[in-house]
A protein has these predicted regions:
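A conserved SF2-helicase RecA2
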Residues: 1-26
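Hydrophobic anchor at the start of a short beta-strand
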Residues: 16, 82, 130
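Conserved beta-strand termini and adjacent loop/short-helix elements that scaffold enzyme active sites
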Residues: 19-21, 85-87, 115-117
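Short, flexible loop segments at the rims of nucleotide/cofactor-binding pockets, characterized by
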Residues: 28-35, 58-62, 107-110
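A short, well-structured juxtamembrane/interface segment
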Residues: 34-42
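Primarily the HKD phosphodiesterase
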Residues: 45-107
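HKD (HxKxxxxD) catalytic microenvironment of the phospholipase D
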Residues: 53, 110-156
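Cysteine/selenocysteine-centered motifs that mediate thiol-based redox chemistry or coordinate metal-sulfur cofactors
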Residues: 157-166
Length: 166
């Protein structure tokens, strides 16, 4: 239900109200995105990470994981800690399908944590930028999906602590 409202707001041109104390630089902008227009800003945020990236997704796709591996190699060299939380698949066929993706990530030094009941799609960068919505950042996406980019240390830190609980 919430995701449908978010899509509707995006289509109507709504935006996220900025905190009055924030400056208006592009890096501090909170915004609504569609599946069609999120990728370039998402990539910029990922590549600008200084210390930590946490991505929580229910599933992985080979194409998106390969793309992420290519872009994250330089981050790992810089010492950025990258963790991927992915849903532990409940049947063997699905588990076999994502196993190569998990191996690709782990082989370059990304920590992959498989957990039950992961359904939310969240990315948190440096405990200050959070991407949240129904776009699977490392998996399959469909038309009309959307997400929010929220720049707020307090919200990002609080959500991070909740998704990292086992």
């Amino acid at each position: 239900m919430y995701q449908n409202r978010l899509k509707g707001y995006k289509h109507l041109g709504y935006s996220i109200k900025q905190n009055i104390s924030e400056n208006t630089e592009r890096q501090t902008e909170s915004k609504l995105y569609s599946e069609e227009d999120y990728k370039s800003d998402f990539q910029k945020d990922i590549l600008s990470a200084a210390s930590k990236i946490i991505i929580s997704v229910p599933c992985l796709s080979k194409v998106n994981v390969q793309e992420f591996v290519l872009s994250s190699t330089t981050l790992l060299v810089k010492g950025v800690n990258i963790q991927i939380l992915v849903r532990k698949q409940d049947d063997d066929a699905k588990q076999k399908k994502i196993a190569p993706c998990i191996s690709m990530l782990e082989n370059i030094g990304i920590k992959v944590i498989e957990q039950e009941n992961i359904s939310q799609k969240i990315t948190i960068i440096d405990e200050k930028i959070m991407w949240y919505g129904n776009i699977n950042f490392l998996g399959y996406t469909e038309n009309e999906e959307c997400c929010m980019r929220i720049v707020d240390n307090k919200i990002a830190s609080e959500i991070e602590s909740k998704i990292l609980k086992p």
